[in-house]
From Swiss-Prot:
Bias kind Polar residues: ranges: 161-171
Organism of derivation: Mus musculus
InterPro entries documented for this protein: Glyco_trans_29, GT29-like_sf
Glycosylation sites: 206, 228, 259, 303, 388
Annotated localization: Golgi apparatus membrane
GO cellular component, one term: Golgi membrane
Function: Protein sialyltransferase specifically expressed in goblet cells that plays a key role in intestinal host-commensal homeostasis. Conjugates sialic acid with an alpha-2-6 linkage to N-acetylgalactosamine (GalNAc) glycan chains linked to serine or threonine in glycoproteins. Catalyzes the formation of the sialyl-Tn (S-Tn) antigen, an antigen found in intestinal goblet cells. Protein sialylation in globlet cells is essential for mucus integrity and is required to protect the intestinal mucus against excessive bacterial proteolytic degradation.
Family per record: Belongs to the glycosyltransferase 29 family.
Compositional bias segments (type: Basic and acidic residues): 81-106
Pathway: Protein modification; protein glycosylation
Disulphide bonds in the chain: 207-290, 293-461
Protein name: Alpha-N-acetylgalactosaminide alpha-2,6-sialyltransferase 1
Amino acid sequence: MTRYCRGLSQRQAFLLLTVLALLFILLFVVKDPRAKDSRCQFIWKNDASAQENQQKAEPQVPIMTLSPRVHNKETTSVSSKDLKKQEREAVQGEQAEGKEKRKLETIRPAPENPQSKAEPAAKTPVSEHLDKLPRAPGALSTRKTPMATGAVPAKKKVVQATKSPASSPHPTTRRRQRLKASEFKSEPRWDFEEEYSLDMSSLQTNCSASVKIKASKSPWLQNIFLPNITLFLDSGRFTQSEWNRLEHFAPPFGFMELNQSLVQKVVTRFPPVRQQQLLLASLPTGYSKCITCAVVGNGGILNDSRVGREIDSHDYVFRLSGAVIKGYEQDVGTRTSFYGFTAFSLTQSILILGRRGFQHVPLGKDVRYLHFLEGTRDYEWLEAMFLNQTLAKTHLSWFRHRPQEAFRNALDLDRYLLLHPDFLRYMKNRFLRSKTLDTAHWRIYRPTTGALLLLTALHLCDKVSAYGFITEGHQRFSDHYYDTSWKRLIFYINHDFRLERMVWKRLHDEGIIWLYQRPQSDKAKN
């Protein structure tokens, strides 16, 4: 009995130990999964880190992220409409990034989007390295009222800019995108619109009755007339920074959409103009004189005017385009000091008026040529002129002659002057800003060649007389003084004749120029 009880106690002890061992094993099994999960988690983190490092080492591809507006608060699914919208925003964002690389940071117009119209205009500061050349201070812009009443300085106007929300492409994939006129529904106005190249070494006139002196005292002109603005473009004034700046303006007021290689090739052939004020520089040292100039337009008002001798009595005579002289000497004179033209106006004049005697430009060792560069065809004209080739493969292919033939192969580059785009834009902005620029037809507008020539004379001469320009009662006269039969003056949309007529009248009324006007009872022969 005693043995049985002792054996039972041993078995109980063994069972107790077994139970304790099982409990210990159970406790270990319960704890072990946590330790295993933690290790798996560590391994996963290492794998994720390795993948992340691998992604960083590989070339980055632009990733389109969804705007917060696309996500719904309760779900992350996106409709196809939203995806298409986001794709458009991504493309616009990439374009905006490309434009930001320009050295000149600008104000861009807002895209056609109802939401963007409600946003305020974003103004971007101008780059500090616009150009080494001095700039004209102040800024002018358009007004709701016509500028023909005097181009009074107004508050600066800039176009609206809105950047689309999208991720930026990799720096190595960015490309500088060129501006295109088709991107704008009206003329773009940049925050550096009114900055012009100035000639700080410009000669000063000693004539107390000079246009420049009168302009400085005129309430209308004193804030808009720049007597020392750069007039001419040459090899010394063509730089990369100038190209970057002027590429924001459409020709003839800049280089937008032009071929930089072509422009550089021809412009750098022209020697630097030593003195912008050519006529003042021609005066003997210490000589005081008021330089008088006659600017002769081609208007029918000159037919039977008998002012030819009066025109020739001026120190310098400016003519333009189809300047027919033979047979009209009594009406328009015979002398020519400056001849203004565009490649198109010159080729057209030779083609149409060749039988009337205008077969080449006015010739003479003292004649200077003023070329107003309208666009690509003008630079193609210059290239063909330097190569002494025809214009067969250009925008003027219909003109069968070599450009040098128009100058009778006696061209002297010292007397061939290119008008600076800054100067042309200045004349447009401050004197002849048409309402057309605020419409979809903005790209084709420019002042007439005669208007550009007259305003050029205002910046070269002391006293200016204008003949053959549009005036009140122009309906009485034919389009041109050399017309053999009466032709009505047609107001094409690419010019603003009414604006020019009002500006010439105001300049005349303020004594800035003298404008030839026929009495109301007079009529031309034709």
